UniProtKB/Swiss-Prot annotation:
It holds the Pfam family Peptidase_M24. It comes from Pyrenophora tritici-repentis (strain Pt-1C-BFP). Residues 60-73 have a biased composition (Basic residues). Residues 1-101 are annotated as: Disordered. It catalyses: Release of N-terminal amino acids, preferentially methionine, from peptides and arylamides. GO terms for molecular function: initiator methionyl aminopeptidase activity; metal ion binding; metalloaminopeptidase activity. One of its GO terms (biological process) is proteolysis. Keywords: Aminopeptidase, Cytoplasm, Hydrolase, Metal-binding, Protease. This is Methionine aminopeptidase 2-2. A divalent metal cation 1 binds at residues 224, 235, 432. Residues 37-51 have a biased composition (Acidic residues). Substrate binds at residues 204, 312. The keyword rRNA-binding does not apply. It comes from the Eukaryota.
Amino acid sequence: MAAKVADDVANLKLDDSNTKPASGAAENGDKPTGDAEHEDSDDDNEAEEGAPEAGEGAAKKKKKRKPRKKKKAGAAGAGGAKTQTAPPRVRIDEVFPNDSYPEGEIQEYVNENAYRTTNEEKRHLDRMNNDFLTEYRKGAEIHREVRQWAQKWIKPGMGLTEIAEGIEDSVRALTGHQGLGNGDAQIAGMGFPTGLSINHCAAHYTPNAGNKMVVNYEDVMKVDFGVHINGRIVDSAFTLTFDPVYDNLVNACKAATNAGIKEAGIDVRMSDIGAAIQEVMESYEVEIKGEMLPVKCIRNLNGHSIGHYTIHGGKTVPIVKGGDQTKMEEGETFAIETFGSTGKGYVRDDMETSHYAMKADAPKVALRVSSAKTLLNSITKNFGTLPFCRRYLDRMGHDKYLLGLNNLVSAGIVEAYPPLCDIKGSYTAQSEHTFVLRPTCKEVLSRGDDY
């Protein structure tokens, strides 16, 4: 049969006068590329279907193909999902249209809690927790996308206000809630203001209006921000440096935080977690300007439990040994954050206050300053017990509010959180993750490829 086919092919003759090249490239003897062949497939099929008319090919012209349009950033992909932009501006529920967000890092319980991994009753309880876990995972995915962009975007010489607003605008864009209407910021958005604490300042620093500070190449900057979805707060922080001389300081905090998370679990005592953290942290040292310095835990800073709309839920997780014998419990959410320092390892209040939060158990007292009443009404509607900063009040159009704000603080209704600093000339670093104690495992919600 093969011989017959060969003979038939040999007898075939092409009428060159009636045959026209498909394209200019073919006329010139050039071979089409693989992509061109792929794109031409539809046209080839059309040509085959219209075979009777092909004999009149000399009289007819082939249709010109329209060039394919390139997809824009943020355009819909497979299944209607969009891709994220830089800076992040596509709502996260458009990137994950089915509301199915990635799980955090799963860590199994060990020792006396190992049975929880396979226990059927615990697995049933775990399946019942999907609703609130979806909200946590959504917030965690927003945190990951924003911080991964921020780590590439932040450069020496940038102003702190520009950095803070860049992060916060991205979080608000991804949640789809700008926080300008009454109550909008309580649906989703910032879990607390973006902390940008530099060098000896360890925590609670964000720029107020008019701040001219910039981050320099030789600085060590802690970037700490939270994302919340319906009051489920994901709290995570990293330390940003440009000079590799500080790598050991940064790595000490990362390793200590991971040790704390590994030790944590249902019925584990806080003191045991603190001991595990301190052992790892203080095994590091860092050489700065020719001097070898030990890395110390900042002993009066702690991790904490996280409540609904409450960043500090009542339990503290120490980062040094001894002390608190309180146990962790099933279903609780914690932020383990560790701070390392080349200074004294002890912080105090310093610099201008920027962070505030209304107390959950705020007393009902008569306010003598009229601006305090107006401000309290706005804080209650827009933030509730979520922390806020002065820039947020400026953004909402409040003017000349400082007297009223100080009145709310002195009345015990609002708590002020001043920056926390070690001795000048020292360097501090931070690492933090949020995790939930599920019935069958620990889920490190904020874990990402970056840290």
